[in-house]
């Protein structure tokens, strides 16, 4: 409702995060849930870092709440009746949510080969004129011979070619057919470990590799862990922040996207979405407006409670 559709045909949505924060999990979780709801196929390109089996176990862990190591080892069968029932109960849902998911390892391929695979898959499996969600994990330099080009030039050309492919090359009479969601690593400015919230940089300056990534995308979000002080102040609002830094299209809740949020201490802050990451399962926990309302309610209750305390000073 705030930022509109993140999977508009012909558009690219980029998630920026440090390594290990959960950008792959977020993109795949979002794409597969949309796929299951609207019956749209998902093509997932992996850049040679995670196997198909690893992703399957992660998604199964997210749906069952059973630790990955139990699933990978097969010990879930020996972990009690409750665990066995949890795993078996989601088999049907797992097949339904991921029956339209296609995995392809493009590690070692140059950008032209990657786009060739995308086009061949689209025309052979999806069919001309039909919608496709394209999940690309993730933007980085390829192994091709780059000559005298800098890293930022190579990455810029990669994003440019993907944009032209989904915007211009593959389309029907009504327009583009492919929606793209991808991710990129942030630079060291985006590190949050051992930092207070006031010292964390939450803007597009943390995007690594090339400024063309920001230029060609329609939506850009920063995904990061909450700092220790944020977790202490916001205990019921998840473990991660999803912060929008660019939005070419907005949803019906425009105020939530562009207006600053007034906090109980009368300061103004940029809105963001709270996410709960637990065992590879992702749940939305409201936005900054919900945090402000919760803190205001708590402050009001404390003030009312203090006003009911009688004055015992008899002097």
Model-derived features with residue positions:
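Structural motif
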Residues: 14, 103, 133-137, 181
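Flexible beta-alpha connector loops of hexameric P-loop NTPases
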Residues: 74-76, 144-156, 193-203
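C-terminal regions of RecA-like/P-loop NTPase motor modules
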Residues: 65, 69-71, 81, 92, ...
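Cytosolic-facing regulatory segments adjacent to core modules
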Residues: 2-3, 37-130, 257
């Amino acid at each position: 409702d705030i930022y509109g559709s993140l999977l508009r045909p012909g558009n690219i949505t980029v998630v920026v995060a440090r390594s290990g924060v959960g950008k792959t999990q977020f993109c795949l979780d979002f794409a597969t849930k949309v796929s299951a709801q609207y019956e749209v196929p998902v093509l997932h390109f992996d850049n040679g870092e995670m196997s198909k089996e690893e992703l399957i176990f992660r998604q199964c862990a997210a749906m069952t709440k059973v630790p990955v190591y139990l699933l990978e080892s097969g010990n879930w069968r020996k972990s009690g009746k409750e665990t066995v029932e949890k795993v078996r109960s989601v088999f049907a849902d797992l097949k339904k949510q991921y029956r339209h998911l296609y995995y392809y390892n493009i590690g070692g391929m140059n950008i032209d080969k990657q786009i060739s695979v995308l086009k061949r898959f689209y025309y052979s499996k999806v069919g001309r004129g039909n919608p496709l969600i394209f999940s690309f994990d993730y933007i980085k330099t390829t192994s091709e011979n780059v000559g005298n080009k800098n890293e930022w030039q190579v990455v810029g050309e990669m994003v440019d070619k993907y944009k032209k492919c989904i915007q211009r090359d593959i389309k029907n009479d009504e327009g583009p057919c492919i929606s793209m969601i991808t991710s990129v690593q942030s630079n060291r400015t985006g590190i949050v470990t051992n930092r207070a919230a006031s010292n964390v940089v939450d803007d597009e300056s943390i995007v690594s590799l090339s400024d063309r990534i920001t230029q060609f995308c329609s939506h850009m979000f920063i995904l990061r862990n909450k700092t220790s002080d944020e977790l202490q102040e916001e205990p019921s609002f998840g473990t991660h922040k999803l912060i929008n830094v660019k939005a070419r299209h907005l949803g019906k809740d425009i105020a939530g996207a562009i207006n600053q949020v007034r906090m109980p201490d009368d300061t103004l802050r940029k809105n963001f979405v709270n996410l709960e990451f637990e065992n590879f399962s992702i749940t939305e926990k409201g936005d900054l407006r919900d945090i402000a309302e919760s803190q205001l309610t708590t402050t009001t209750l404390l003030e009312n409670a203090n006003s009911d305390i009688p004055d015992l000073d008899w002097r």
